[in-house]
Amino acid sequence: DMSMWLMEGKNPVSVYAKSVDGVLNQWGTKDSTFGIFTMDDGTIWSMNISWALPEVWPGSVYGLEIGIVGTEGVIDIEDTHRDLVLASNIAQGAGYTSREYSPPQGRHVDFLTSYPAGDIQGGQFWGPMREETNTWYTRLCTGQDTPHATAQDGHRNLLMTMAMDLSAKEEKEIVLPERMDDIF
């Protein structure tokens, strides 16, 4: 959503992506995907996401990086919150646990606040998802304008990520139609 907001008025014309699936393929997903989108004015932006990080990775769940490069500016987003680091001789809990998996060793370094939705503290939920939920609720109750993605934004972005997956699967650049709905 944010990448498209920052490039308002520009339309994606193609995507080229590569994926690897050496670890998580047994669960039907990719370890990591890297994609480069080209916009109608030549601007390019890259996005990579990796779910198969080492079990001792200090971030909670994944690594996400987004870069937008243009002649008028550059933005580089690294979304693992490496600015708040805890290092301890006492092992920290897993960054993410599920009912079926528990990592075999503790993590001694932790990127605090790196869980995407936020953190639980004192029985309360804090972080980006709390703020987004509260402002969304305010929008519903009061009609106040908020900076949330629209359903159309979400649909377009879903189709763009699907095109990214298709590019990785077919190992070729995917030229995007004017109407994203025409691709799927």
Segment roles from a protein language model:
Residues 1-63, 152, 183-184:
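Rossmann-like dinucleotide-binding domain that binds NAD(P)(H)
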Residues 2-6, 135, 160:
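Amphipathic alpha-helical segments that form well-ordered structural scaffolds
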Residues 6, 139, 167:
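Conserved catalytic core of Hanks-type protein kinase domains
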Residues 13-14, 171-174:
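Short, well-structured active-site flanking segments
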Residues 34, 39-41, 57, 63-152, ...:
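C-terminal glycine/acidic-rich active-site capping loop/insertion
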Residues 155-158:
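C-terminal interaction segments
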Residues 160-170:
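Short arginine-rich
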